Amino acid sequence: MEFVMKQALGGATKDMGKMLGGDEEKDPDAAKKEEERQEALRQEEEERKAKYAKMEAEREAVRQGIRDKYGIKKKEEREAEAQAALEANSEGSLTRPKKAIPPGCGDAAEEEDESILDTVIKYLPGPLQDIFKK
C-alpha cells in the first residue's frame, strides 16, 4: 500500500507528513530571527513617526508664517476671543442674551391645562364626557 502511495504522489509524502502535523524541522535560530524582525519593524515604525512629526512641524511653521504675513488668526484663537468678548459684553449689559429655559419649566403649565380640562369634563353630562374623552 505504501508503495502505491509513493508512486502515486511521486515523493511528495515527505511534505505531506509535515503538512499533516508530523515532525517539523525546527530552525534553532528561528526565535532569534523573529526577534530581530520584530525589532526592525519597531525601529521602522519609530522612524516613520519621527519623520511624520518633523513634516508636520515644518508644515505648521509654514502655516504660521502665512498667518503672520496676512494677519490671520488660528481658529482656536478666534473662538477664544469671541467667547471672551461675549462674556465681557454680557456682564453688565442690558442687552445680554437670554438664558436658556431649564428643562421641565414649561412642562408644568401643560399639565395644569390638562388637569383643568379634566375637571371641566367631569362636570359635563355623561354623553358629552364620552365625546370629549375620545
From Swiss-Prot:
Keyword Coiled coil found: yes
Lineage of the organism: Eukaryota, Metazoa, Chordata, Craniata, Vertebrata
Localization terms from the record: Cytoplasm, Cytosol; Perikaryon; Presynapse
Predominant location: cytoplasm
Gene3D superfamilies for this protein: Single Helix bin
Stretches with biased composition (Basic and acidic residues): 15-81
Disordered: annotated span: 1-112
UniProt-annotated stretches for the region Interaction with the SNARE complex: 48-70
Name of the protein described by the UniProt record: Complexin-1
GO BP term, example: modulation of chemical synaptic transmission
Coiled coil regions, renumbered to chain: 29-69
Record's keyword terms, sorted: Cell projection, Coiled coil, Cytoplasm, Exocytosis, Neurotransmitter transport, Synapse, Transport
PANTHER family: COMPLEXIN, COMPLEXIN-1
Family per record: Belongs to the complexin/synaphin family.
Any one Gene Ontology molecular-function term assigned to this protein's record: SNARE binding
UniProt cross-references to InterPro entries, sorted A to Z: Synaphin (IPR008849)
Function: Positively regulates a late step in synaptic vesicle exocytosis. Organizes the SNAREs into a cross-linked zigzag topology that, when interposed between the vesicle and plasma membranes, is incompatible with fusion, thereby preventing SNAREs from releasing neurotransmitters until an action potential arrives at the synapse. Also involved in glucose-induced secretion of insulin by pancreatic beta-cells.
Subunit annotation: Binds to the SNARE core complex containing SNAP25, VAMP2 and STX1A.
GO cellular component, one term: cytosol
